[in-house]
């Protein structure tokens, strides 16, 4: 009986139907394994591709670790922007930028401006900045200079506008009138400092910005001091411009301001040498002679009473505050010291002044300065 059961089991186990079923099951399991492995492989490839794509999108646009800028002009197109990118050093990822630009529809959103390319900015982030017009501001320093033409020449390299456009705005009568100044007094609006502006700022907008800074600078306290000195803010700037040119010594400036205020109050001509240089347009003059003193100009304070029509340079805040905080004394004259230190000998009487002037003239002669 036992042998019969074993025989039946052996028959079932080794029957053709059973063998086929086992084979079919093995095939199915193998297919499943292959499908799983293929799926895992495809997923791995997708992960790698996604990683590469993310790297290309968010990796630094170029190899520059410091500041680097892309300047886009008003007439630039998407193609000219990409051409500018390709012309940059440090291996820019222009192809990736084109791809990102297509994703962001940059072609219809080209904005002029100055854009940061360096400091590790990613390509996708860069293209978002370009599309949104998110410029990097410019640090614009307003310097102490002699003329409006000098100012235009100094500011232009930092801006899209050229020096001619800036100078035109600085002398535009209608624009200046809207700001309460004219071509003679507009230098007072320029308060030397460093300001943040956009590279694309127009000359007109720049003047309005400078006017706002001027209004901020002239606090209630400064206005009160100007009034106490008997001057308007523009007159303070005009006198400060003379003080600026008379001495670079900050400690001496309040004394110089006090001397000129004394002369104004006594009805004396200022007789300031820097105004003669301005009238002649010769700022390199080292020795003022009698022939220079007769220059026919409203700025020549040897010929004209009172202050000049406007500032003879862009005065620094230090010179302006020297006028507002002028020194109270009885000096009416001053002359450069004979030691050429850049400081001055002050005098209350004309006789004292002549003695000081004689010593200085002798020192000039010894040095052969004419």
Residue ranges with predicted function:
Residues 5, 10-19, 24:
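Short, positively charged and aromatic/hydrophobic N-terminal segments
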Residues 271-313:
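Conserved SxxK-family serine transpeptidase/carboxypeptidase catalytic domain
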